[in-house]
Amino acid sequence: MTNLPAGASRSATDVVVSRAAGTGPATWAMGMLFERLAGAGETDGLLGASVVTQPPGQASPLHVHTLEAEAWFLLQGAMTYRAGERLIRMTAGDFIYLPQEVPHAFRTTGTVPVRFLALTLPGGLLDIYDEVGVPAAERRLPDAGVSDADVARWLELAPRYGLRVVGPPIPEAEA
């Protein structure tokens, strides 16, 4: 519902987003594939949703989100997730929800890429990857991994997206 009379406002019940499989924008960023399902601009800022594919062995630094809560549903593969002091081993079918301000990090384990549904509430956080990355030529992992330039750009943009790095990645030996 996009055609509202002048001066009218929208409510959460007016926002309907439907996307057929494989039709959303796709981005290569930070060595990953992000397939947009719904962005903040489509949901009046209420939700961000993407399917993310991440290669084996990739890890994030320990960080917090100051603006959004985050939820993941693991579709394929295995990963280790640190949430606060908890170390959680996840496999396909597992789910995690994190309120904002909870320090967390993740590392892909095993030999196959992981695919997960990433949700942010409210939306907006996933837009950072559109700024860091480039439109994906195909719906697959990019040939290049994470570059120093990607990391520098992510760190430069992080404060604007309410991201704060607070520690190192999960060591491989702990994953």
Task: Identify the meaning behind each predicted range.
Residues 35-36, 50-65:
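Conserved short histidine dyad/triad with adjacent acidic residue
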Residues 112-160:
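A contiguous, mid-protein "functional segment" used to position or interact
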Residues 1-47, 141-175:
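A short, N-terminal "cap"/entry segment at the start of jelly-roll beta-barrel domains
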Residues 85-103:
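Short acidic-glycine-tyrosine-enriched beta hairpin
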Residues 67-79, 84, 93:
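Glycine- and acidic-residue-biased ligand/ion/polar-headgroup-sensing regions
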Residues 58, 67-68, 86, 102-103, ...:
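A generic "binding-loop/recognition-motif" signal
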Residues 62, 81-82, 98, 104-110, ...:
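Short beta-strand His + acidic residue motifs that chelate non-heme Fe in jelly-roll/DSBH
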